[in-house]
Amino acid sequence: MTAIDVGTESEATGNVPPRYACGETFVPKSRYIDPEFLQLELDRLFTQVWQPACREEEIPDPGSYYEYTIGRQSIMVVRQKDGEIKAFYNACTHRGMKVVRGTGCAVGGDLRCEFHGWRYALDGRSSFVPSRDEFLNRPREQWSLRQVAAGTWGGWVFVSMAEDPPELLEWLDPLPTALEPFRLQDMRFRWRKRTMLAANYKTVIDAFIEGYHTPGTHPQTLRPVQGPRPSAEPAPPQEFVYAPYTPTIPYRNHSRFIYTARPDSGDRDSARKEQAARPEVFANSMQYNYLEVGSLVTERDYRAAQQLATMEPSDVPPFVLYHQICEELALAEGVDFPKMSMEQYFAGNGDWHVFPTLVILVEKSCLLGYRMLPDAEDPNRCVFEMFSLEHFAPGEVPETSWLEVERWQDHDGWGELPTQDLKNIDAIHAGMHSRGFEGLWLNTAQEMSIRNEHAIADRFIFGVDGDG
């Protein structure tokens, strides 16, 4: 097989070794399967960027802590007595023992190392060292835990191991402005699940940051006219013309894709447009999301869709009617429902890749999220998290915890649509090891979010500033 020319280090890729050099629309598979590249990511990328460690609700009280692990680095996020949040490397300054494991709350207001009983105040200061006078020549300031930069946005706690990281809101641009009306910080978990996948973490991310795969993987979503649970039989070629158009929008540090009209559609889908104008057809799609995704539509929204399905066509588009009914039901049940114009809605709605590990699909009432974390040593494994957040009425927030399964196949509650993605992922990554596969050739309109993530990574790994 003829090798694919991805450029040379001196021609177009700066300091990027040829083995890892991307073309304009090409990404070599080595960036997904090489242990050496994984180590570069862990050493040069994850040590420099802001990354979501946990949700604020996971550390609700003073003394609450959450252990966030990325590669071999363990970071503890701790709620302070005044409600503020600090983060520290999770290593006792005596012999390196982890001070906390998992989640919990500091007993007596101190963080205690279980090895020799050293203690730290919630702000990281050394508060107790047995036989302190027997330690010689160590300055007092070196006894404290080493702090990690921490900040909050949208209800997430972000951490950065960089010595001088950019301001968090600057790093997140344009998300804070685009998503402000949705008030993500006021959402709470509806459910959350975690498992391990036999794939590189980017293989999994890539499956959730482009919509080009929709007709091939999720053909049932092309058939709302069939009802809330349409057929998932593979789509014939002629049905692909009705696939959603999902152009990607690259930003400096992140990306987004949206659903919109295909520029060249003409009149070929006029029949589909007539179907979409029928309230029950749009309602079927919303009901499907509730029944087979378990997110993007709340239980209230599901009732709104059922109500919409009984209505006759009118001058008001079903999409607008649906949102009106959703808001009316939410307000009637005491939900502090976010207020926004349709312009604001479309500016924030969509599928966001919050580089490097978080993907969120945002609606007014709820959010579907994914987080993918690399394995510390194996580029062919990763942690996969899937969760749903929601705006609840006071007193209605459910108690949740992470449902953890060793193999995703051991849990039958993923829903039809996520299960289709999960079935693909193992096979996608396995195929990357084929001698007949060189790398990813990307759709220039609907898959450039993937190219953008590699351009962002190259800034940190190789010092090359691309066009992202």
Regions found by a protein language model. Give the residues of each.
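Non-catalytic accessory segments flanking enzyme active sites
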Residues: 20, 25, 30-76
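Rieske [2Fe-2S] iron-sulfur-binding domain
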Residues: 58-181
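Short, contiguous pre-domain boundary segments
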Residues: 15-29, 185, 395-399
